[in-house]
């Protein structure tokens, strides 16, 4: 299918209904049928179960349990770096934020204000800073970890579309990551503020965080804003902060004052792993 037809199909699909149905099916505990579906998925996408804490497909009571599986201890060691990669995936885009514009794909960008749900004051903290967008494919590990230590200040649920977030739609749907449903997490770190955005997509049944649990569903159709200034929720570098139940994309924002320099091996479409060096301060 051509890119144009693939993108057109995304506009025509009943994405909300499809996602709701698939979310319910992914939670179903259907015994041997669930195991058969998991085995088929592993074969179809080449999932490396040797890295899973439990490598037996029959050990997972539901597809969601399999999809959010834990890794064996030690298979993703943390690099000695100011920022480490928070997920397994592939780089969609990385680079400088131009004013408040974030590059999505050739001919497409979107504003930091739109990404965080319309809060211009929050977005301004990242003017001329840096961003990283990482796509998680179906075969990847789908828990999200902290790129650096941070204290949680705020979480914003932003309702939106449920377009697929694969490379084809990233090239073809304007403002994709600022249009899709998303969960915006705001942290204070030793390097200044940091935003970590979990972006939903077609068939992504839900997104959750370690401090809140499942954020969606429900899908109330309005922005929800949680503040944590009166709580001491501190997560260390490499510590789990959230997960996707069926995969998607993570977008990170860093302020100009952080002096961030990306790993020179990080380029468009390059595969990345949790714990690898993502960036250092004023380093090549």
Curated annotation (Swiss-Prot):
GO molecular function, one term: phosphatidylserine decarboxylase activity
A single cellular component GO annotation: plasma membrane
Domain of life: Bacteria
Reaction(s) this enzyme catalyzes, per UniProt: a 1,2-diacyl-sn-glycero-3-phospho-L-serine + H(+) = a 1,2-diacyl-sn-glycero-3-phosphoethanolamine + CO2
Annotated metabolic or biological route of this protein: Phospholipid metabolism; phosphatidylethanolamine biosynthesis; phosphatidylethanolamine from CDP-diacylglycerol: step 2/2
Subcellular location: Cell membrane
Classification via Pfam families: PS_Dcarbxylase (PF02666)
Keyword Zinc found: no
Cofactor note: Binds 1 pyruvoyl group covalently per subunit.
InterPro entries (alphabetical): PS_Dcarbxylase (IPR003817), PSD-B (IPR033177), PSD_type1_pro (IPR033178)
EC number: 4.1.1.65
Membrane topology of the entry: Peripheral membrane protein
Broad class of where this protein is predominantly found: membrane
GO biological process, one term: phosphatidylethanolamine biosynthetic process
Enzyme's top EC category: lyase
NCBIfam families assigned: PS_decarb (TIGR00163)
Family named by the database record: Belongs to the phosphatidylserine decarboxylase family. PSD-B subfamily. Prokaryotic type I sub-subfamily.
Protein name as it appears in the record: Phosphatidylserine decarboxylase proenzyme
Record gene name: psd
